[in-house]
Amino acid sequence: MLKFEARPQASLFWRYASPLLALLITVVLGIGLFVLLGKDPVRGLQMFFWEPLKSAYALGELMVKATPLLLIALGLAVCFRSNVWNIGAEGQFVMGAVAAGGVALLADKDTGRWVVLAILLAGVLGGMFWAGITAWLKDKFHANEILVSLMLVYVADMVLSYLVYGPWKDPAGYNFPQTKTFEAVTQIPRLMTGSRVSVGILLALLCVAAVWVFLFRTRLGFAQQVGGLAPAASRYAGFSSRQSLWLALMVSGGFAGLAGALEVAGPIGQLNPYVPAGYGFAAIIVAYVGRLHPVGMVFSAVLLSMFFIGGELAQSRMGLPKSITGVFQGLLLFSLLACDTLVANQLRWQGRRA
């Protein structure tokens, strides 16, 4: 019979092969799901893995989706490596969007292009403020950061709804819950004509390099990771757990807020109730599929972007519910968790005893 046996040390091979095996299992389970739903599995897989790549416009949309996923995942990786469990990046994303939207609404057509920087800064500060609530409650009252950050997601959604249904509602918007469309001067510069992709993707890649340097080439980044991997050793070395907590959540909140600012000042162009698209939760999967490594998360962000686009296409072309995106994300996450058992364990055949 097959039996799991602990490895003497974690397998480096399976650490990086596990996400690939998890993706393969997700594809196989996805085929089974399409068959159960009475849909052509080949066409279903085409929606998820070919359509998002087949044209320049499709690649542009892929980058539009990947930008917020990558930025949020970078911040979450810093948190998770620091043993700080920020599950509320979605709320920080929303509050970053709200803060950025507030600045954008103050601009008029005569405002200078400097307002774009002000919008991005407001987004960063909005996300940091929302993450700071979690950090303060954890630091002051030892509140569980998982529950606090998660509950604050719903508070952020309510703040957004209040604003777009109330004081920020566009009087000329036919009673739709949305702000007026932001002035053209507030828009993030586009990379390609005829596409929604903006310079935000370049900013995200710059942040990848910055996080890599921070984590692997600075003493502060080393201290963050020691605090996460070995808290006792961290205290013995004199590293501050309070500093680690605040820094992790401020970085994570700042990246999530920046993602929110890029979203509302880019492809959306206004505030509405549909700003919360689930990027904050999907970025958790991005972070773990990418092994909490900045470069790995570039590839996992692209993969999860394909799931978002594939879900939209499956809904419009195959009549499947929009929740198919979440189903594929869940399949990937649980497959990864299952495959990760091979990192610390190995399968051995154990014969029956006489």
Predicted segments with their positions:
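Cytosolic-side transmembrane-helix boundaries in multi-pass membrane proteins
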Residues: 1-25, 31-35, 229, 236-243, ...
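Hydrophobic core segments of alpha-helical transmembrane domains in multi-pass membrane transport
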Residues: 19-35, 72-77, 97-103, 124-129, ...
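Interfacial/capping segments of alpha-helical transmembrane domains
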Residues: 31-52, 167-179
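Single transmembrane alpha-helix segments in multi-pass membrane proteins
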Residues: 32-37, 47-107, 120, 124-146, ...
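Transmembrane alpha-helical segments in multi-pass inner-membrane proteins
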Residues: 250-330
